[in-house]
Amino acid sequence: MSDKAVLSCRNLGKSYEEGPESVVVLSGLQLELHPGERVAIVGSSGSGKSTLLNLLGGLDTPSEGSVWLAGEELSALGEKARGLLRNRALGFVYQFHHLLPEFTALENVCMPLLIGRTPIPEARKRSTALLERVGLGHRLAHKPSELSGGERQRVAIARALINQPGLVMLDEPTGNLDHHTAQGIQDLMRELSTSSRTAFLIVTHDMSLARQMDRVLRLEDGRLVEA
């Protein structure tokens, strides 16, 4: 992987109409992430951190500005092409995991591989290995309702990593984890940033997690500033 930015945005903004008024949530944001870089975004509740992740991940449309993911401008892509790019180049860990309730932990992690047409035996082998790596080798056949909050979060993290994307975005990734498990996830991110040059963009309230990143940015008054 080259040092070309895996993610960038220019003059990114988002506003909402509330009656006759326009409420500005984000304005004029500039950001670049490079291979292997780990960046944390902190800020108070309601500052727009999750909105920013959704814009950067192509899950929402900006009111102004542009986002490039893996060299592709998201606004120039159709919905299908954007979805394929996200599946290939981006892993996303939501604050509340968003696992498919009718599928097992193993099947949830397999899903991105199967969407990308990986043969089922290979998908199961790779997914099993990754779930073992995050400490869930004994929970492969359990559905989300049979897992604890921390276990569900680890399944979501494994699902985000399974395609070996160039970038992983995480929204409060350690919020449901005990200290030991959270530290294990941090160690895994550090290892992957070095060995695979995976970039990580993390939204968190946990300053102990943020301080372990390469850069910490604060979102305040709709803008990103160095923390």
UniProtKB/Swiss-Prot annotation:
GO cellular component, one term: plasma membrane
Entry's localization field: Cell inner membrane
Keywords: ATP-binding, Cell inner membrane, Cell membrane, Membrane, Nucleotide-binding, Translocase, Transport
Superkingdom to which the source organism belongs: Bacteria
The keyword Ribonucleoprotein belongs to this UniProt entry's keyword annotation: no
GO BP terms in the entry: lipoprotein localization to outer membrane; protein localization to outer membrane
Subunit: The complex is composed of two ATP-binding proteins (LolD) and two transmembrane proteins (LolC and LolE).
Family in the record: Belongs to the ABC transporter superfamily. Lipoprotein translocase (TC 3.A.1.125) family.
Known role: Part of the ABC transporter complex LolCDE involved in the translocation of mature outer membrane-directed lipoproteins, from the inner membrane to the periplasmic chaperone, LolA. Responsible for the formation of the LolA-lipoprotein complex in an ATP-dependent manner.
Protein name: Lipoprotein-releasing system ATP-binding protein LolD
Source organism (scientific name): Pseudomonas syringae pv. syringae (strain B728a)
Lineage summary: Bacteria, Pseudomonadati, Pseudomonadota, Gammaproteobacteria, Pseudomonadales
Gene from which this protein is expressed: lolD
